[in-house]
UniProtKB/Swiss-Prot annotation:
<dbReference type="Pfam" id="PF04117">
    <property type="entry name" value="Mpv17_PMP22"/>
</dbReference>
<dbReference type="GO" id="GO:0015267">
    <property type="term" value="F:channel activity"/>
</dbReference>
<protein>
    <recommendedName>
        <fullName>Protein sym1</fullName>
    </recommendedName>
</protein>
<dbReference type="GO" id="GO:0005743">
    <property type="term" value="C:mitochondrial inner membrane"/>
</dbReference>
<dbReference type="GO" id="GO:1990542">
    <property type="term" value="P:mitochondrial transmembrane transport"/>
</dbReference>
<keyword id="KW-0472">Membrane</keyword>
<keyword id="KW-1133">Transmembrane helix</keyword>
<keyword id="KW-0812">Transmembrane</keyword>
<keyword id="KW-0496">Mitochondrion</keyword>
<dbReference type="GO" id="GO:0005739">
    <property type="term" value="C:mitochondrion"/>
</dbReference>
<comment type="similarity">
    <text>Belongs to the peroxisomal membrane protein PXMP2/4 family.</text>
</comment>
<feature type="transmembrane region" description="Helical">
    <location>
        <begin position="107"/>
        <end position="127"/>
    </location>
</feature>
<keyword id="KW-0999">Mitochondrion inner membrane</keyword>
<dbReference type="InterPro" id="IPR007248">
    <property type="entry name" value="Mpv17_PMP22"/>
</dbReference>
<feature type="transmembrane region" description="Helical">
    <location>
        <begin position="169"/>
        <end position="189"/>
    </location>
</feature>
<dbReference type="GO" id="GO:0005737">
    <property type="term" value="C:cytoplasm"/>
</dbReference>
Length: 206
């Protein structure tokens, strides 16, 4: 079954590489946010206040936001062309056949260039999709860019080393997207947390 899927995937990649990457990243991005929302909603509903008679006071439990899932799907589609071309450039400039040092070069460049770009792109895209405009995107980046990038540097160098060392080009994005399911859960929760903090600040001001 897996070999059949891999054959079809490779055929699709040969025919339309960028579209294949967009579909892969968009699908896995949507899955990651759906899981993140599920975890958040489960915890929120579980901790809902219960009256003395044992009746739950929260009669309107939270439900998943389809809009937020679609924001992750569209983000995956939007960033994939940039990410695939970036990976293809690294593969061409630093071929693994010329030694392990090229893996190190790829990882260092990836973390120095694409990690900051991807982080900024993510929060900007999400904030604009929420209708908060460029000023809102700027404020969001001011609040969460550096903490998120620091967290990125604790996680991604290891996985990108494995990725660049073991995976051929057509599987590098799927591998990264699979790891990114867990990373996007973190980003999704971070983004939602930032939105809640922003909302609470507005309530205090007015």
């Amino acid at each position: 079954m897996f070999s059949r899927f891999a054959t079809r995937y490779n055929a699709l990649f040969e025919k339309a590489p960028i579209m294949t990457m967009c579909l892969t990243a968009g699908t896995l991005g949507g899955i990651s946010d759906a899981v993140a929302q599920g975890l958040t909603i489960y915890q929120t509903n579980k901790n809902a206040m219960i009256g003395l008679d044992g009746v739950r006071l929260n009669t309107h439990p939270e439900i998943p936001s389809i809009k937020r899932v679609l924001q992750f799907v569209t983000f995956g589609f939007a960033i994939s062309p940039f990410q695939f071309r970036w990976l293809r450039l690294l593969s061409a400039k630093f071929p693994i056949e010329k030694g392990a040092i090229n893996v190190v070069k790829r990882v260092l460049l990836d973390q120095a260039v694409f990690a900051p770009f991807g982080t900024a792109f993510f929060f900007s895209w999400m904030t604009l999709a929420e209708g908060k405009g460029f000023r809102g995107a700027y404020d969001k980046l001011q609040a969460v860019f550096w903490p998120t990038l620091k967290a990125n540097y604790m996680v991604w160098p290891f996985f990108q080393t494995v990725n660049f060392w073991l995976m051929p080009l057509q599987y590098q994005m799927p591998f990264a997207c699979t790891v990114a399911i867990f990373w996007n859960i973190f980003l999704s929760l971070k983004n939602a947390s930032s939105m809640q903090e922003s909302g609470s600040q507005e309530i205090e001001l007015f």
